[in-house]
Amino acid sequence: MVPPIIYKYKRRKDRRLGRDDDSSVMMTRRRPDSDFIEVSDENRSFALFKEDDEKNRDLGLVDDGSTNLVLQCHDDGCSLEKDNSNSLDDLFSGFVYKGVRRRKRDDFGSITTSNLVSPQIADDDDDSVSDSHIERQECSEFHVEVRRVSPYFQGSTVSQQSKEGCDSDSVCSKEGCSKVQAKVPRVSPYFQASTISQCDSDIVSSSQSGRNYRKGSSKRQVKVRRVSPYFQESTVSEQPNQAPKGLRNYFKVVKVSRYFHADGIQVNESQKEKSRNVRKTPIVSPVLSLSQKTDDVYLRKTPDNTWVPPRSPCNLLQEDHWHDPWRVLVICMLLNKTSGAQTRGVISDLFGLCTDAKTATEVKEEEIENLIKPLGLQKKRTKMIQRLSLEYLQESWTHVTQLHGVGKYAADAYAIFCNGNWDRVKPNDHMLNYYWDYLRIRYKL
């Protein structure tokens, strides 16, 4: 049995109801540019019929399916008549092709449904469809969904390819339309420079309804390595089960002085030798040997020695007190670990209090300490000065190196300013070297 053609019916707001019985039908004129006939009944349902060799067409179910109408076409016109036959074949033949259920509102605000879709109406041109208020819906049309993108992902571009499995497609079946949709995983905003294809990492979900399409989904997603925001330009793809080892296990960054223009030096720990703590040896003043201490250069000044050291541009403190060897030794003792400017402000007051070695032994220690306190080490230096003064007053010493607190610096100063043996010594102090160079130039040595 060939199923009859099922037509789609739609209510028209510009038609009036027939006031006879339920089978009363109003006939409309045939459009001159179309071969279709528009028919409506009192329930404001209508359809288009196309004439062919068979003049009779079964309308199937009209509106709620209460009656079956048969189109009778003759030479003088066509009319609809009610078919009272209770044939089950004719009744169920209307359900052979089931379409999408559409809901519409009538003039009174009630919702009515229409379940019939005619495939022949889809072939008509756009003008005939708009004039006859026929709506067409195809379940197999493709619905491309726009992916919701966070404002943080505006810089990233996701290519949506129209290959199989990538496009969003809706498939029709008897139970309705179900969507097979390709999802794109969420990407961190730190990967704005990278472009991710939609088909490379996707989540394919299939279900019977549009709302529950996420149920039963299978994920096929590529792992993405998390990268610090400071490395936005570089994108490192991490393969599964191939995680790169940390570089800190192999290299160590060493802090380098700013005077080295290189950004940094990486030292391999396997080749790095353990640094030994080198003990810094303090700077020790040169010490005279026993033979040097007993040299004739450091002999005690005799009364017949008439050496007068000349004045120099260096303006040393010893140049002003060369006439008293005790003062020269005291000045050298105070200049140890002290600048000449500090000592110059104290030395005049000290020699005012202690004019010679004998007076220094008679002055109380507290008075000397108060004078040399700005230089530091006042207690130690006070005891050294008084002990030096006691030994200096004795007649038993023959060399200046035998006195307490006299080192190479004081012995060289004694030989240069007191004895005049400057050409036989080589001082280590920088100020004495200036004066020694001056004497060499003066006497052309």
From Swiss-Prot:
Any one GO CC term of the record: nucleus
Record-listed E.C. numbers: 3.2.2.-
Active site, UniProt feature: D429
Intracellular or extracellular location(s): Nucleus
Tissues with expression: Isoform 1 and isoform 4: Expressed in leaves and flowers, but not in roots or stems.
One of the protein's GO biological processes: DNA repair
GO molecular function terms noted in the UniProt entry: DNA binding; hydrolase activity
Keywords annotated in UniProt: DNA damage, DNA repair, Hydrolase, Nucleus
Function of the molecule: Monofunctional DNA glycosylase targeting U:G and T:G mispairs. Excises uracil derivatives and exhibits a preference for a CpG sequence context, irrespective of the methylation status of the complementary strand. The activity follows a biphasic kinetics, with an initial burst of product accumulation followed by a slower phase. Specifically binds its reaction product. Triggers the base excision repair (BER) pathway.
Domains (record comment): The N-terminal domain (1-290) does not play any direct role in catalysis and is not required for product binding.
The protein's name: Methyl-CpG-binding domain protein 4-like protein
Gene: MBD4L
